[in-house]
């Protein structure tokens, strides 16, 4: 793969975004219901049955302490001063998300991660582990055989490893023991929260709800929260189901450019135009001139006068040149020009950062 391949993909994606129309979306895809959320759970446990790849107990005293405590609870007392040398046990942290409306007896997935110096959790079995919430209450119990996505092997001082061996998952490995109370059907109102705050989209959602269920049903509180007053003579759950399936055409959000500083990935959500600026970046030279063009129809033809923008792009690769960008130039043109001369994604990242600092980039710049 050449270095210009990522920028070519960026150019194609930018053109595709501009060509796609803004279609209507369901309210359930644009909003969440306040109070309907998952809850994070965490627990400490032991994984046994490892093939000599567990914790080195001399370096992880908490593993030995956990084993001794577990055996004492089972009625097995070890002699004082016993030095356990175990290689098939590993101390782990178990995490999971308790889904909304989960009831006792329902299964949930959990992730098991080594917290000691175990070389691999492959082939291990998680012993019964209580999972607690932020309130220190037990909401689920986890136990089961781990599934590890990686693989590793070694001999004569040489080893190789594919993917990560220190963490794995147990599908349906936890059983819910306690439900989180929900007040969704008890409150007099329902609050919808837009996933992306936008006053125009909030207004459109309110209009769609009021048009379907009557004026006064929905009221915007701000650019994100919408308060809904369900009718008293219908089932609350059926009302929410019908409400979530209403179609709304969201407004176009603000222009945004996302940069990944580690990989050089650049993503644009729409057309981005630039103000006048000049940038010198290494040996890159890009000059883009944009001029208005008027399309005048013939006399009595019934056509309309249309104003368009004509861009002329000149590309050079000479040391110490200046990148000149006139007002109205699109970011897509800049990407295409840089792609044509073999610039790397890191070059594009540096140039966009300079444009934003100079105030010529008409978009929110986010670096991840």
Swiss-Prot record:
A GO CC term assigned to this protein in UniProt: bacterial-type flagellum basal body, distal rod, P ring
InterPro entries: Flag_FlgI (IPR001782)
Keywords: Bacterial flagellum, Periplasm, Signal
UniProt-recorded Gene Ontology molecular function terms: structural molecule activity
Subcellular location, principal: periplasm
Origin: domain of life: Bacteria
Gene Ontology biological process terms, A to Z: bacterial-type flagellum-dependent cell motility
Compartments where located: Periplasm; Bacterial flagellum basal body
The keyword Ubl conjugation appears for this protein: no
Coiled-coil parts of chain: none
Residues in the signal sequence: 1-24
Function: Assembles around the rod to form the L-ring and probably protects the motor/basal body from shearing forces during rotation.
Protein family per UniProt: Belongs to the FlgI family.
Quaternary structure annotation from Swiss-Prot or TrEMBL: The basal body constitutes a major portion of the flagellar organelle and consists of four rings (L,P,S, and M) mounted on a central rod.
Record HAMAP family: FlgI
Protein name: Flagellar P-ring protein
Gene giving rise to this polypeptide: flgI
């Amino acid at each position: 793969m050449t270095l210009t391949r990522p920028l070519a993909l960026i150019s194609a994606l930018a053109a595709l975004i501009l060509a796609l129309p803004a279609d209507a979306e369901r309210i359930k895809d644009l909003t969440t219901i306040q109070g309907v959320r998952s809850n994070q759970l965490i627990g400490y446990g032991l994984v046994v049955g490892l093939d000599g790849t567990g914790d080195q107990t001399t370096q992880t005293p908490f593993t030995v302490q956990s084993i001794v405590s577990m055996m004492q609870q089972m009625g097995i007392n070890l002699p004082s001063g016993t030095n356990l040398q175990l290689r098939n046990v590993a101390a782990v942290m178990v995490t999971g998300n308790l889904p909304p409306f989960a009831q006792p007896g329902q299964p949930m997935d959990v992730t098991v991660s080594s917290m000691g110096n175990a070389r691999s959790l492959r082939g291990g079995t998680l012993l019964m582990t209580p999972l607690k919430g932020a309130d220190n209450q037990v909401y689920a119990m986890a136990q089961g055989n781990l599934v590890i996505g990686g693989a590793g092997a070694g001999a004569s001082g040489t080893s190789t490893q594919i993917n990560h061996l220190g963490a794995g998952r147990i599908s349906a490995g936890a059983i819910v023991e306690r439900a989180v109370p929900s007040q969704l059907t008890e409150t007099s109102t329902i609050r919808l929260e837009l996933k992306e705050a936008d006053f125009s989209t909030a207004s459109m959602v309110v209009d769609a709800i009021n048009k379907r269920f009557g004026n006064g049903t929905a009221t915007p509180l701000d650019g994100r929260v919408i308060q809904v007053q369900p009718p008293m003579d219908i089932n609350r759950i059926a009302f929410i189901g019908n409400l979530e399936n209403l179609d709304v055409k969201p407004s176009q959000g603000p222009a945004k450019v996302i940069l990944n500083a580690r990989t050089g990935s650049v993503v644009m959500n729409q057309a981005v135009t630039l103000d006048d600026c000049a940038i010198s970046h290494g040996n890159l030279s890009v000059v883009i001139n944009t001029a208005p063009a008027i399309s005048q129809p013939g006399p009595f033809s019934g056509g309309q006068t249309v104003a368009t923008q004509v861009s002329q792009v000149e590309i050079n690769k000479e040391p110490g040149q200046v990148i000149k960008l006139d007002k109205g130039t699109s970011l897509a043109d800049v990407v295409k020009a840089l792609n044509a001369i073999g610039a790397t994604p890191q070059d594009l990242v540096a140039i966009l950062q300079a444009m934003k600092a100079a105030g010529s980039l008409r978009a929110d710049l986010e670096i991840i």
